[in-house]
Amino acid sequence: MRRFTSALSFALTCGLAVGLPVTSSAQATPAPAPDAATYAGPVAREGDIVILGGRLWDGIGPRSRPNRGILVRDGTILQVGLPPDMDTAPAQVLQLDDHAFIMPGLFDLHAHYAVDLFGDGRVDEYRVNPVLFLANGVTSTFPAGEVDPTEARKGRERIASGEIPGPRVFTSGPYFGTARYGWKPDAMTPDSVKKEVEHWAAQGVRQFKAKGIRPEQLQALITEAHSQDATVTGHLGSGFRGTVNPRDAILMGIDRIEHFLGGDELPDSVSAYASLEYLNLDDPTTRAQVEKEIHLFVEHHTYFDATLTAYGYYGDREPAVFKYWADEMGFLTPYARQVVESHLPRPVNEQFTRIYYVKRRTVKMFYEDGGADLLTLGTDHPSWGEFWSGFGAHRELQAMVLAGIPPVAALRAATINAARALGVDQRLGSVEAGKYADLLIVGGDPLSDITATRHALYVIKAGKVYHPAELFESVKGKMGPTSEAEADWWKGNVRLGGG
């Protein structure tokens, strides 16, 4: 695992995560926690937030505990655990009921802002999607490849300026590989890859995404990214037709792997999906190969983003996971809704259905065989309009639990593990003094019923309190074009010249 080795690199990462310019590192770093030797005790001030009542899960321990009070100042958690006689009068007080549950804000490490409403290519949408992520308690996102880096940059700037509410966006820059519009594999020599990494690192990218990349290109990407104090993740293959098996990428030094584990059980004679859909985990040889690959992840401290529901989304949409608890299609404009409904019902991808249930078993093996602290949450839900990426984290959490992962481990994957995978756990991922005040407060106990994360009472990002119902209401009927005259902007093949 590549750790950020400089304070500047960390500050740039957190700064760019909210759209700040590269020179704004001072704005990105919160005040340190008070020194225990000199701190006289908490005194609430005007502008502070005090959270009282409910139960607290800090993202670290195995259980929740009664919340004895949290003091937030200037976007940072100043203290966890307050004196019962503390004067809170100058502060904004959130007095919670007993059923309220406080936890760190969620991370989505495969958080696509891309939509494809017409079936004519993806575009990145940064006006409604950010609001939907935040309203669902997702306070940090990694897009895992930007279809349109220019539009993504504008979106981050809108969030940073306060024009729209949204999560932290840890920019990935464009895809490195054939997933990028206009990528020319033969022209992208290792030297070309290195120069591109230098360019995007200068723009503040500290995490890169590979998809559809050749071995020599991936090695160049990893080497140069690490020299820039950046990390790399990848959607890889089996080694078939010039792809890279995750096994080999781990040996190259990659930091994270998306989707599937790879290894000897995915031979390079066929595509990864062709092997994965019929993977027989009851066969001792196959099971031993998977276990060997898991041990490689653990040995090299490589993070794994399983994205279970990405395959369920294209597959049979398991009803227990893909049921509605909100009117998601209500966020479409009337015209866009007509377009989306004209394509329904979507065909079921039978291959992805089989892969979904295989992956349920392999992710449980990963957890049980030593990978619990390396498991992260990512959704990979580029949307066709029926389901939105912002809601996906809750579906992914439920799918992980249905796979046999304990709720507390699934929640860690969505909080502290994800923060560590990005190298930002110094300031994010848990409820501790000195960290950014990114919190999700829900009604119910997700440690006993993981679906409780869906019922957000409050979302706090950088110390600002949001009411989810108000956020949802603010973007109803606003996703997509309002008429045929606006349709071309929403067609990636037309506007961006890709597929």
Identify the residue ranges that each predicted region occupies.
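Bacterial N-terminal signal peptides
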Residues: 9-21
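Histidine-rich, glycine-flanked metal-binding segment
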Residues: 31-47, 56, 60-103
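Acidic, glycine-enriched loop/beta-strand segments at the rims
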Residues: 37-41, 56-69, 81-84, 388, ...
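Histidine-centered divalent metal-coordination motifs
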Residues: 107-114, 235, 259, 307
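Active-site mouth loops of central-metabolism enzymes
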Residues: 113-124, 178-192, 239-240
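Divalent metal-dependent hydrolysis catalytic cores, especially in the metallo-beta-lactamase
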Residues: 129-150, 166-176, 199-213, 222, ...
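Active-site neighborhoods of metal-dependent hydrolases
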Residues: 199-206, 213, 262-398, 402-403, ...
